[in-house]
Swiss-Prot record:
Keywords: Cell inner membrane, Cell membrane, Lipid biosynthesis, Lipid metabolism, Membrane, Phospholipid biosynthesis, Phospholipid metabolism, Transferase, Transmembrane, Transmembrane helix
Physiological role: Catalyzes the transfer of an acyl group from acyl-phosphate (acyl-PO(4)) to glycerol-3-phosphate (G3P) to form lysophosphatidic acid (LPA). This enzyme utilizes acyl-phosphate as fatty acyl donor, but not acyl-CoA or acyl-ACP.
Any Pfam family the entry gives: G3P_acyltransf
Gene giving rise to this polypeptide: plsY
Protein's name in the database: Glycerol-3-phosphate acyltransferase
Subcellular location: Cell inner membrane
Bilayer topology term: Multi-pass membrane protein
Amino acid sequence: MLTLLAILAVSYIIGSIPTSLVAGKLLKGIDIRNFGSGNAGGTNAFRVLGWKPGLVVTLIDIVKGVVAAVSVVAFFRHHPIGAFPDMNEVALRLLAGMSAVIGHVFTLFAGFKGGKGVSTAAGMLIGIAPVSMLMVVGIFLLTVYISRHVSVASMLAAIAFPLIIAIRKYIFELGSGLDYYIGLFGSPISFHDSLDYHLMIFGLIVALAILYTHRTNIRRLISGTESRVTFGKKH
């Protein structure tokens, strides 16, 4: 139990790192929550700071999820506090990742007012199901390019994930996942791309949660007032 609590606590602290707030202070000396949509996430960073800072913020928020789901769990597996949790590996990684997402949304370092958790949740899932998430990222980028709405891309990508898991698992009959081996700088690296059923259930819950957290964006989309991302230079 102590090991599980430690995993959740460390993951929460990592998720709480307020990336967009730090970027806003460093680049413009502002609290990004006072501009744009008022949200401290990647979407508002794109909107307020420009696409380059927005991209950096988003990538760092993604890394927070990967670290929580992969590195934190791996660390405490080798350095447990008492017994290591006897539970499904994917379920444990999902718990760690979700703790990071909660930290991102309710950040410890900024009055518990953070982002919407999309990028950190994406990072968590990249660490668990990288191939499926590569497809989701493709859908996200294509949607941003076509619609210029990061919010639309986030919602569509969230809906796509559980569908991709289900199609690969049941239609293509890939079972619980595949192991991949790649060469990097002359050294073989292996990783597992999970199709565990926990992912499909979790993906459905996350999709609903992301739709809920984007309800103001949906209202702005309906009214035609949702901001669009521009790929030119931000002045």
